[in-house]
Amino acid sequence: MLNATTLVHAGRPRTLVHPGAFNPVRIQARHSPGARHLRLCLQPGRSLFDALVQPLQAMGICSASTTILGGDFDHFVYCVATPDATGRALIAYSQPLSAGPAALVFGNATLGKRQDGSPIVHCHAAFRTGSGQMRGGHVVTEACIVGPAPIAVLVTSLDGFELRVAFDPETNIPLLQPLSEEHHV
């Protein structure tokens, strides 16, 4: 019997079956007539969220794709994906886990807007804990504090459309989705 967490092996490696209606269009794409590429330095002592959002908003960037090139954090908090106990979705995030001081090896973060229009940063990263263990997961950006040295981030603005959290009927969870300019609030 198949359920939301069943892995199907039909001639392909590990196919995950989401509980909602299947959407044959896997990538929702939008065209942008232009984009800005820049390098940003996250400032020490600030949360990852504030260090990323505030300077980008000051430049008029509300949606972006970023690559965090690595650096030290005085405090690092993350979650991991666990099976959703309710069965409504494939996964749910664990309770936040504190790694204490950590060295981010590499991460990707997406800047967009919540349903109410406030900023959101969705970030996944690989990092090394103070005891040397390698970990990875969903980063709680508001709780991660940049360490003593600035951290370099490569930014590509997504001009001409925005990323906004909206309910996804296939996964049954809210996801960042591209919306064209006429949908901007």
Regions inferred by a protein language model and the residue ranges of each:
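Short, well-structured hydrophobic secondary-structure segments
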Residues: 41-107
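Flexible, glycine/proline-enriched loop segments at strand-loop-helix junctions
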Residues: 36-42, 139
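N-terminal, Lys/Arg- and Ser/Thr-rich interaction peptides
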Residues: 7-36
